[in-house]
Design a protein with these regions (language model features):
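Membrane-anchoring alpha-helices and their flanking helix-loop junctions
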Residues: 1-86, 98-158
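Solvent-exposed interhelical
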Residues: 89
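Extended, alpha-helix-rich binding/interface surfaces that flank or overlap catalytic cores
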Residues: 94
């Protein structure tokens, strides 16, 4: 029987999901670049873009693997059953969000698209001001000392 005091879902029910926010940032940046192209670096630097993007994908996949190994869901709308402290979570409390940021940075360099950097700013602002504080309140409420200890020992970003 479930405990009626426990929340029914994860920390983000009804909230615009971060993957959608970052997809919107990418699509907006590309659309703006098509309308008003703003290149910001020599084209030779574009070779770094695929490398940064690949690092982003690897970080995302490693983070997902740790969630699966801990037996908890990565989806913000589903119940969180464990605090993940292994893999990339040893260094950052938000490696999935870091992977989203790295992906947009990598695409920006790869495509030499300044607008992607511009649209990244509100996406990161939304994470920092709305999503992460809400997630942290949820985790503190549901995992008390376990999350407080983790929060004290691992930085939010890097």
């Amino acid at each position: 029987m479930s405990n009626p005091t426990e929340p029914k879902g994860g920390p983000l029910p009804g909230l615009l999901r971060p993957p959608i926010v970052f997809l919107a940032a990418i699509l907006s940046g590309i659309a703006l670049n098509r309308a008003w192209s703003l290149q910001f670096m020599p084209s030779t630097f574009g070779l770094l873009g695929p490398l940064v993007s690949l690092c982003a994908v690897l970080l995302f996949l490693l983070s997902l693997r740790e969630f699966r190994a801990a037996g908890t869901s990565v989806r913000g709308s589903e119940r969180t059953t464990a605090i993940v402290r292994t893999g990339p979570y040893r260094f950052s409390r938000n490696p999935i969000y870091l992977s989203f940021i790295l992906l947009v940075l990598g695409l920006s360099v790869w495509l030499n698209d300044f607008w992607l950097l511009v649209t990244l700013v509100p996406a990161v602002g939304f994470l920092a001001a709305v999503v992460i504080p809400r997630e942290e309140r949820f985790l503190e409420r549901n995992f008390h000392d376990q999350y407080s200890s983790y929060k004290a020992s691992v930085r939010r970003w890097l």
